[in-house]
Amino acid sequence: MNALMRRACCGALFPLSFRLAALSPMKGASNFSCGNVCASPAGCWAPPSGHDTGIKVYNSLTRRKDPLILADPTVATWYSCGPTVYDHAHLGHACSYVRFDIIRRILLKVFGIDTVVVMVVTDIDDKIIKRAKELNISPVALARTYEQDFKQDMTALKVLPPTVYMRVTENIPQIISFIEHIIANGYAYATSQGNVYFDVQSIGERYGKFNDSFSDTASESASQDKRHIRDFALWKTSKPEEPYWASPWGKGRPGWHIECSTIASSVFGKHLDIHTGGIDLAFPHHENEIAQCEAYHQSTQWGNYFLHTGHLHLKGNEEKMSKSLRNYLTVKEFLKSFSPDQFRMFCLRSKYKSAVEYSNGSMHDAVNTLHTISSFVDDAKAYMKGQLICQPVQEALLWQRLNETKVNVKAAFSDDFDTPRAVDAVMDLIHHGNRQLKAVSKESNSPRSSVVYGAMISYIEQFLEILGISLSQNQVAAEDRHSAVLFNVVEEMISFRSKVRNYALAADESPNAIGQEEKQQYKERRRQLLLEREPLLQACDIMRQHLAVYGINVKDRGNTSTWELLDRKEET
């Protein structure tokens, strides 16, 4: 009996009643373990066989960090819940998609794991039908409009597109077939009203992986035709003037949960590596997806890892950002004030699974972080060019800090994609780099340490590129001929201003002799020249202020001047 119990626990396809009995304590049965993790009464999670990537992810199925094990060490299958396209995407949606985009980039660029990502577009839904009626347009026209709008928003936020988008309405035959198979397996039933429901009681305690606090005392409402209150719709009979499709159960349309199960299974089959979505989708949506897929495939572990992002909420409001609560900011409205890179840094400053508060203060923290990085890179490049004269650099210490940073960042990424820890490690490196970039008036005879600063610049730019961020200076690179021309115009303008400024400061009036009398004469002459040339110096200062209005930050460094392009949205 112990052998049979072990097979039942580890997922052998015994009849359900036998499996449930085997999972119950039995008199005289010895203890055993099959290496599975049981986070709830809904069943056990078994580590998949395959390649251990060295990454640990917080798995909502087990409620702990598990090693990410893939059948193919270079490819992960990934299903992402996509938008229901009835309105503009808001910042809460954007936060979730940007966070998962960051994870996808880390998997590829740090660990060499490509991702095959399928995202569903729900283009038929109660909300779509309701909104279409309000606007007096067809549900199809509404859905296509906001689907394109969503894709434009994601492009603006630099979110990589999925490998493939799949619309619900283009998969209706597959959905009907999927439902028929679940019915044939004994896990769903059709009603006389033309509805089809999943029979939750048919899978017993396996239901409740994300929420096991159910009451079995509730009975079905008299206004509905399902057997039990927990049963959920796979197919819904159509109402007058609603879109419908013909089916074995009459005219109707699919339920919400069955769409994702069908589309994910049609691409990935009976095994899925990673499933993602917002934490609000864990129950009931992802719970029901799992129930449907395991009923269809006759398996006990369809998806191996479920990753969920935390809510984004406005400062002073604990409720998640939501259209239904009318406490949201659209992506388009947000991008009038801040840039995509600034929002991405905002997302990086918190763990992906944590709730995050949005406010002007939290956004300006992200803006300041990017500015600190950009300023350091600009100063380090000026040092390499000989434009910034500094005291001798402790080169060995900086090499040590750089190597430690690389190790710490890799460790942070391996630990459930801990981006706040990774960013902190890079900011600590910048702190130590800045400490040694202190300008001095005269250059010493000591050799300059350009190479270590070049290596730091290269690593920091690579770090940002991995995460999907571009430094502002790099964004000036010739996207087209006009950008290149403007770049050269600014270069010439700053060079001319630098020459005028040096003349106004009488920087070339230093005497060759160094006697006491000559020094005194030089000081007096320079004082007179500074008074005479004061209007030129004021004009240089005014030019710097005017250029700052257009996002051009001029830095005067002794006898030389450099510039960087800042995002004007930083001033908002």
UniProtKB/Swiss-Prot annotation:
Q: Where is this motif: 'KIIK' region?
A: 127-130
Binding residues annotated for Zn(2+), in chain numbering:
C81, C260, H285, E289
Enzyme class per UniProt = ligase
Q: Which domain of life is it from?
A: Eukaryota
Query: What does the entry give for GO biological process?
Result: cysteinyl-tRNA aminoacylation
Cysteine disulfide partners in this protein: none
Q: What is its EC number?
A: 6.1.1.16
Q: Which GO terms describe its molecular function?
A: ATP binding; cysteine-tRNA ligase activity; metal ion binding
InterPro entries linked: Cys-tRNA-ligase, Cys-tRNA-synt_Ia_DALR, Cys-tRNA/MSH_ligase, Rossmann-like_a/b/a_fold, tRNA-synt_1_cat_dom, tRNAsynth_Ia_anticodon-bd
Q: What is its main location?
A: mitochondrion
**Pfam families from the UniProt entry:** DALR_2 (PF09190), tRNA-synt_1e (PF01406)
Renumbered ranges of motif 'KMSKS' region: 320-324
**Domain notes per entry:** 'KIIK' region and 'KMSKS' region are required for cysteine persulfide synthase activity.
Q: What is this protein called?
A: Probable cysteine--tRNA ligase, mitochondrial
